[in-house]
């Protein structure tokens, strides 16, 4: 990444995620976008399900409960995927508008998984 782009990122600008509109964003890979990037805003919540022997379904169930509880913050783009931020994506407060204190953060606690 160029020094210029690093400076832009501290201001909240990612040149691969530019829409043709002044006030609005566009969906990922929509016609008219400049670049193939996208910006994600994250909100954290948790959903609770009973633990079973199917770790995949447990994860899907808890994710869906968290999303329907109150973590959903806007329209999802089902053209490509519903909820992801891949290598072309930019995460607000991590990739752009980053607070350097994030790098010093430690977990409140850790818990060993039984499986």
From Swiss-Prot:
Cross-referenced InterPro entries, in alphabetical order? Answer: His_de-COase_proenz, Pyr-dep_his-deCO2ase_N, Pyr-dep_his/arg-deCO2ase, Pyr-dep_his/arg-deCO2ase_sand
Q: Location of site Cleavage (non-hydrolytic)?
A: 82-83
Cofactor(s) needed: pyruvate
Under the subunit heading, UniProt states: The proenzyme is a hexamer of identical pi chains; each pi chain monomer is cleaved to form a small (or beta) chain and a large (or alpha) chain by non-hydrolytic self-catalysis.
Question: What is the species listed in this Swiss-Prot or TrEMBL entry?
Answer: Lentilactobacillus buchneri (Lactobacillus buchneri)
- Catalytic activity annotation: L-histidine + H(+) = histamine + CO2
Q: Name one GO biological process term.
A: L-histidine metabolic process
What GO MF terms are annotated? Answer: histidine decarboxylase activity
Instruction: State how the cofactor is bound.
Output: Binds 1 pyruvoyl group covalently per subunit.
Question: Could you say which EC number(s) this protein's record lists?
Answer: 4.1.1.22
| The entry's keywords | Decarboxylase, Lyase, Pyruvate, Zymogen
Q: What is this protein called?
A: Histidine decarboxylase proenzyme
Q: Which residues carry this modification: Pyruvic acid (Ser)?
A: 83
């Amino acid at each position: 990444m160029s020094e210029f782009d690093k400076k832009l990122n501290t201001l909240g600008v990612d040149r691969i995620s530019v829409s043709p509109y002044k006030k609005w964003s566009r969906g990922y890979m929509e016609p008219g976008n400049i670049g193939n990037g996208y910006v994600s805003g994250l909100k954290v919540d948790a959903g609770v399900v009973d633990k079973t022997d199917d770790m995949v379904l447990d994860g899907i169930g808890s994710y869906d409960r968290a999303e329907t509880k109150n973590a959903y913050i806007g329209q999802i783009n089902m053209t490509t995927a519903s909820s992801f931020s891949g290598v072309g994506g930019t995460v607000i407060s991590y990739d752009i508008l980053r607070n350097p204190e994030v790098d010093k953060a430690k977990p409140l606690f850790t818990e060993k998984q039984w499986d």
